[in-house]
Swiss-Prot record:
GO biological process: photosynthesis
Family classification: Belongs to the Psb28 family.
Gene Ontology CC annotation, any one: photosystem II oxygen evolving complex
InterPro entries cross-referenced by the UniProt entry: Psb28_c1_sf, PSII_Psb28_class-1
PANTHER family in the cross-refs: PHOTOSYSTEM II REACTION CENTER PSB28 PROTEIN, CHLOROPLASTIC, PTHR34963
Subcellular location(s) of the protein: Cell inner membrane
Sections of the chain in a coiled coil: none
Name of protein: Photosystem II reaction center Psb28 protein
Keywords: Cell inner membrane, Cell membrane, Membrane, Photosynthesis, Photosystem II
Length: 99
């Protein structure tokens, strides 16, 4: 089963995902993952983990998003520099969609 977590045992619900490809290097892609209502204690968050039966993808680029001074969620930026990394992320997202 595929899960997305900031902290062990606390599964997060992904609100939105946007994938962008580099204009000059099509093998380089970035996924922006949005979580509007994180369940984890944000003071303890150090990384974002995407786990499934293949293993774990860990991302450390996490940004707090605010609108007019109010917290609206978190944005996780996952950079993929190869087709293999993109394929792995795609397989995870397929599993996450079925979970």
């Amino acid at each position: 089963m595929a899960v997305a977590q900031f902290l062990e045992g606390i599964n997060e619900e992904i609100t939105d995902i946007r994938v962008m490809a580099s204009k000059y290097d099509t093998s380089r892609k970035t996924a922006l993952i949005y979580i509007a209502a994180p369940k984890a204690d944000l003071n303890q968050v150090m990384s974002f983990r995407m786990r499934d039966e293949e293993g774990e993808i860990t991302v450390r680029d996490i940004r707090s998003k605010h609108l007019n001074g109010k917290f609206i969620g978190l944005e996780i930026s996952h950079e993929m520099g190869s087709d293999a990394a993109w394929n792995r992320f795609y397989r995870f997202m397929e599993r996450m969609g079925y979970a």
